[in-house]
Amino acid sequence: MAASEAAAAAGSAALAAGARAVPAATTGAAAAASGPWVPPGPRLRGSRPRPAGATQQPAVPAPPAGELIQPSVSELSRAVRTNILCTVRGCGKILPNSPALNMHLVKSHRLQDGIVNPTIRKDLKTGPKFYCCPIEGCPRGPERPFSQFSLVKQHFMKMHAEKKHKCSKCSNSYGTEWDLKRHAEDCGKTFRCTCGCPYASRTALQSHIYRTGHEIPAEHRDPPSKKRKMENCAQNQKLSNKTIESLNNQPIPRPDTQELEASEIKLEPSFEDSCGSNTDKQTLTTPPRYPQKLLLPKPKVALVKLPVMQFSVMPVFVPTADSSAQPVVLGVDQGSATGAVHLMPLSVGTLILGLDSEACSLKESLPLFKIANPIAGEPISTGVQVNFGKSPSNPLQELGNTCQKNSISSINVQTDLSYASQNFIPSAQWATADSSVSSCSQTDLSFDSQVSLPISVHTQTFLPSSKVTSSIAAQTDAFMDTCFQSGGVSRETQTSGIESPTDDHVQMDQAGMCGDIFESVHSSYNVATGNIISNSLVAETVTHSLLPQNEPKTLNQDIEKSAPIINFSAQNSMLPSQNMTDNQTQTIDLLSDLENILSSNLPAQTLDHRSLLSDTNPGPDTQLPSGPAQNPGIDFDIEEFFSASNIQTQTEESELSTMTTEPVLESLDIETQTDFLLADTSAQSYGCRGNSNFLGLEMFDTQTQTDLNFFLDSSPHLPLGSILKHSSFSVSTDSSDTETQTEGVSTAKNIPALESKVQLNSTETQTMSSGFETLGSLFFTSNETQTAMDDFLLADLAWNTMESQFSSVETQTSAEPHTVSNF
């Protein structure tokens, strides 16, 4: 303690005399050397300088001469500034030290004036600078200077500055807080050498080892800083190990094998495999190998990639078996072709390929459903998606044969057939009486020739499990585009039927359900839509319209008498060629006169009847005629006649409770809305493509709503298919109560927008039928009709006239109830 106080007193005395003593010595040394300051020659550490004449040492190259700087005591005792706030107003940045502040001021604010120790680039030509301690008698004087200012400051603060920081354990004092902290780490510890000599600090131990050459102990080899780093790393490693252990205790989510494999599924095209009784054939993917716990809910829809579908533009989404998603069809317009995204309701899909644009037929006729156990049937969903096309031909090459030659540019068909019934076995009855058939199809047919006819059909059926229900929704958009005329045909049909189940059983022949859809199509198209058959309608084999038409199967007459069947079919003929009459010979003819006009006065060129829904269909190897055999074609002069029709038909079938248990009640609700547009080819078309030099335009709007309620079980068969076969221009009803109301509205005869007169007509017909069965053969019939027609239905109408006449006929008929005993 006394030594430290004496050293402090000597230091204070040196501080008092050092300011003038050191410069004097430096000046004297410089004057004696008569040149720049040169540091003394090298000597051993801890040795004292010896006189020059005492020993002769070899000449050693002198270090380069430099500038010797002796800083003042106040400059060395100045505290180091930390966390310095930038002096520029509004900056607010805090710098860790003064050099960082100077760098910030120069680089960020471009300020160099008033900076303490500004950053100046060192001149390479100037010599090095040396810094010596200002305390007189200090060994780190001019003879042993420091190369950096920080080193001389550290020396001064450690050896000569006031020791303000004291240790609480050993009462030692230190000039800086950092020195006290370093001492606290080693305070009270004993550093023992391998020879057994103890030391109070690691530094003293290192000095002993350096002098004696002993081996340093392993626990003291690493410096304290490195030990601290190693301890921190070990602590962090422990924390990480604990975290990993806690995570290992929890279940780790793993990727679902089913989801990963679902994108690579290839659906089998065989109905027999998809209808097998084994459950493994009805699952899309294999079950996971081990149980898995998902953090997120499992998705309900899986995307099925079908790489073999080369021409398809409609992706198919197949939900899982336990999915509650509803079937959805989304249409996407992709230019000329119409795409769709179809969500199939169940988990089994089938893809059928092998289509050709000319002779469109599938690979082979699909086999029948063969199941060993007729009772253990499971729900099966089959999806058929077909798209095939051909490059369009040049329209200029087909000016002479417009009606005889048409090429397919794009055909896109998507079908979904769901069978929730039991089994499909020929010549056998089903085990239960519940059956349901759901079909959803979309067709895009476009013809690149003089007559362009794209057609889009959408069909959807909803069937509950308790009753046999059939619903068909069809929408057809047909457009005709030639170099001389243009027109548009739009048809929308929706049918809903509900039938009460009875004891009768249904037997269906599903042979070749989808195999022969396009089997007999060459340049013409003949696709027949069949019946939606329920178990309360027939009890014998029923013809399915998708079968080849050269092998038709008819119904038994006895069965037809016992249980009526509703047959829906349609023909795309624009106008009917004959009248429709049912078993009761009650007919409503709307366009019979117009038909005669078109068939007699326009024989110039024949319009090719592309029968999409026809009754007669030759074999697959036989070329179809230009028109149906049973219906003569209607001649049109394409250059003089233009026809476009927009037909929207909505049909709903509802079930009425019967008063007796034996008869089966059937109800039919038909609502038809027709927009019929007739114009000369030289007249201007509204909303259609064509020339702008039209001379005459006539419009006819017809809206018909018909409600047909119950057909008794004893009544003869009502061929509704024949009714709808001729474009719904003639309607035959067999109902007890009929009410028809027709309104016709005509616009002014002179319209300044056209060169000639334009006549607009609107006809609306509403028919309601209802009845009640009392004695089994008694009908109460009441008919009321009101009609308004225009003169274009007359036989003497000329299409090329500049003026047209208007005539209105209103008829109202009321029939009293009467009794009918025999049908």
Swiss-Prot record:
Pfam families registered for this protein in UniProt: C2H2_ASCIZ, C2H2_ASCIZ_4th, C2HC_ASCIZ
Task: Give the molecular function GO annotations.
Answer: DNA-binding transcription activator activity, RNA polymerase II-specific; DNA-binding transcription factor activity, RNA polymerase II-specific; dynein complex binding; transcription cis-regulatory region binding; zinc ion binding
Q: What is the annotated signal peptide range for this record?
A: none
| Protein's name according to its UniProt entry | ATM interactor
Organism of derivation = Homo sapiens (Human)
Q: What segments bear the compositional bias annotation Polar residues?
A: 275-286, 613-629
Principal localisation: nucleus
| Self-association state and partner proteins as the record states | Interacts via its C-terminus with ATM. Interacts with DYNLL1; this interaction inhibits ATMIN transcriptional activity and hence may play a role in a feedback loop whereby DYNLL1 inhibits transactivation of its own promoter by ATMIN.
Query: Which keywords has UniProt assigned to this entry?
Result: Activator, DNA damage, Metal-binding, Nucleus, Repeat, Transcription, Transcription regulation, Zinc, Zinc-finger
Q: Tell me which Gene3D superfamilies the record gives.
A: Classic Zinc Finger
The top of its lineage is:
Eukaryota, Metazoa, Chordata, Craniata, Vertebrata
Q: What residue spans carry the region label Disordered?
A: 28-67, 214-234, 268-289, 610-634
Q: What does this protein do?
A: Transcription factor. Plays a crucial role in cell survival and RAD51 foci formation in response to methylating DNA damage. Involved in regulating the activity of ATM in the absence of DNA damage. May play a role in stabilizing ATM. Binds to the DYNLL1 promoter and activates its transcription.
Q: Where is the composition biased (Basic and acidic residues)?
A: 214-225
Question: May I have one GO cellular component term?
Answer: nuclear body
